[in-house]
Design a protein with these regions (language model features):
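N-terminal localization/anchoring segments of enzymes in phospholipid and broader phosphate metabolism
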Residues: 1-295, 299, 303, 341-343, ...
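Helical hairpin unit composed of two closely spaced alpha helices linked by a short loop
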Residues: 304, 314-336, 340-341, 345
Length: 457
């Protein structure tokens, strides 16, 4: 009864509430236990996490000012909406470089770790104990021996993708490492957090250079090595004032996990101007009052005048975003959604395909990229605004996971990202409404059943 009441009062998605009520009442013992483990998706950060130093950056004034108005251009209202949703300032004068696949990202990240003189912060969802993971572990160990202050945070579930977990190797090398929200049979009091994962990817070197995006640390990202399960992905090297916001996000997660507050010039030095891109970090998670990524996406779609390009590995965004996509298309905005023809999760593919017709019939375009599986996440609006980071267009990223994205304003950077999109579209197949409707009835039924579980995927 208590589980049913909790589901009715706390589930914002009516489908999720209905499914959980069905499970609770049809499985009298197992149902409530499953709900306790997987259905409770809110946690409260310990007060210590609030003690993390506020970001030391130069916010754009409320009127944006003449210089920054030219950078934000006709997307000033989008900037204001996001400011109200996340209460984090935009920062000017940043420089961002894309790093394609582990072939480009890993050497750059390893070189940065080897160059560190004061501090290293590393947060990853998956950190495998494979060839690539061992390279990172060894580089971190070398940094510790040089006297660099190192902190490594890995999602507890993400450590289980390889055995033995990389944490064993890191601890043996005296690298300070912690697991985010660990849970096991021996810690039943943590069962309510087992479904809440930290999907963020952050590396900050000396508080001045950062890396973020969608890439985990695993060998499959290095395509030149011809791995068994290759994965294409996108990461970014970042310099400028916005690096302090990335460091603050890491410091908050580290304080929440370990109780240690990272502060002072060692972690938050003064940051020089490095470029011409206006940027801001957007953090999201089940402890936040607002679903900040969802609100950002809705605001961006409402502001779009000419074009929207979405690159995501998983796509079942929910009714509100489907409506926003369709409204943009009906206003004459060209909406392109680029997905992998087959992801690494078959059941998720089925759920996604069951709702393609909803956006195709209103004029959105869906493009399917050939193998290898593309795990990249990117959104471009009007060739001027870019959203990059860890979040996918699915219920897990938009409601359950701790995510970290970055929004960037500037035509030069958006043009560079547009070329990456163009390259992916060259070999892609455009899915039509007729094609989607031509699926056989057994396939449609299978996909529709899978979609019922989309709130949990």
């Amino acid at each position: 009864m208590l589980a049913s009441i909790h589901a009715l009062l706390n589930k914002r998605d009516s489908r999720a509430a209905t499914l959980w009520l069905g499970a609770i009442w049809s499985l009298p013992l197992l149902g409530p236990m499953l709900y306790l483990a997987l259905g409770v998706n809110r946690i409260r950060r310990r007060a210590i996490s609030l003690g993390v130093r506020q970001t030391v950056v130069r916010p754009i004034p409320r009127d944006l000012g003449e210089t920054q108005t030219s950078a934000v251009e006709n997307l000033e209202m989008l900037a204001r909406v996001v400011s109200r949703v996340i209460k984090q300032p935009l920062t000017p004068d940043n420089h961002l470089d894309p790093l394609v696949n582990g072939d480009e990202a890993f050497p750059a990240m390893l070189a940065a770790i080897d160059s560190a003189k004061k501090s290293i912060s590393l947060l990853s969802y998956i950190f495998d104990n494979d060839a690539s993971g061992k390279q990172f572990a060894d580089a971190l160990a070398r940094a510790v021996k040089r006297g660099v202050q190192v902190r490594v945070l890995i999602d507890a579930a993400g450590t289980r993708y390889s055995w033995p977990p990389i944490t064993h190797r890191l601890k043996h090398e005296k690298v300070p490492v912690a697991k985010f929200l660990p849970a096991s049979l021996f810690t039943p009091w943590r069962v309510t957090t087992v479904n809440l994962r930290n999907h963020r990817k952050v590396l900050v070197i000396d508080g001045q250079t950062a890396f973020t995006g969608g890439m985990n640390i695993r060998q499959g990202n290095v395509l030149a090595d011809k791995p068994k399960s290759p994965v294409r992905d996108l990461h970014f090297r970042i310099e400028g004032p916005v690096v302090a916001q990335l460091q603050e996000a890491f410091a908050s997660d580290w304080a929440f996990t370990t109780g240690e507050v990272l502060d002072g010039d060692l972690w938050f030095p003064e940051l020089p101007d490095r470029g011409h891109t206006v940027a801001r970090i957007i953090t999201d998670g089940p402890d936040a009052d607002f679903e900040t990524v969802r609100w950002t996406l809705l605001a961006a779609l409402a502001e779009a005048q000419n074009s929207v390009q979405i690159l995501t590995p998983y796509f079942f965004p929910g009714n509100s975003l489907v409506t926003a996509l369709n409204l943009a298309a009906l206003r004459g905005v060209r909406v392109d959604i680029i997905l992998p023809a087959n992801s690494n999760l078959r059941f998720v593919d089925w759920a996604s395909r069951s709702m393609w017709w909803q956006v195709l019939e209103r004029g959105c375009r869906i493009w399917l990229t050939p193998p290898p599986f593309d795990h990249s996440k990117l959104m471009i609006v009007d060739g001027h605004w870019v959203l990059l980071g860890s979040a996918n267009w699915d219920a897990r990223s938009l409601r359950l996971n701790f995510e970290l994205n970055l929004e960037a304003y500037g035509r030069n950077f958006a043009e560079r990202m547009g070329k990456i999109i163009e390259e992916k579209l060259r070999g892609a197949h455009e899915m039509t409404l007729a094609e989607a409707d031509a699926r056989g009835y057994p396939t449609k039924l299978r996909d529709a059943i899978a979609r019922l579980f989309s709130p949990f995927l």
